């Protein structure tokens, strides 16, 4: 089954992203995986999504956060959606 994983229609992933990013900002010495947010759910659907952004973004595969300078930038971000 193909799932829509765009940011505008994937509130679960976006919410997890935001919480994970805030957790990182609060504890810059410890980066957590988005799966930490959803690990208590029995099933999660993960995929890679390409998108352009003008804001800060995080690269979960490298387990680090990068502040992206203003301007369009392509990124591949690991996203998980609670089913």
From Swiss-Prot:
Q: Which UniProt keywords apply?
A: Early protein, Host cytoplasm, Host-virus interaction
> Which superkingdom?
Viruses
Say yes or no: keyword Chloroplast present. Answer: no
- Up-regulation conditions: Expressed in the early phase of the viral replicative cycle.
Q: Name one GO cellular component term.
A: host cell cytoplasm
Where is this protein localized, as stated in its record? Host cytoplasm
| Function noted in UniProt | May subvert the host innate immune response by interacting with host IL1B and interfering with its function.
Query: How does this protein assemble?
Result: Interacts with host IL1B.
Which family does the record assign? Answer: Belongs to the asfivirus L83L family.
Identify this protein by name. Answer: Protein L83L
């Amino acid at each position: 089954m193909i799932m829509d994983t765009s940011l505008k229609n994937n509130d679960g992933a976006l919410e997890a992203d935001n919480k994970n990013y805030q957790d990182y900002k609060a504890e810059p010495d410890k980066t957590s995986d988005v799966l930490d947010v959803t690990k208590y759910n029995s099933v999660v659907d993960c995929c890679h999504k390409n998108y352009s952004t003008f804001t800060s973004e995080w690269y979960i595969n490298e387990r680090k956060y990068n502040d992206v300078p203003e301007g369009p930038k392509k990124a591949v971000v690991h996203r998980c959606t609670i089913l």
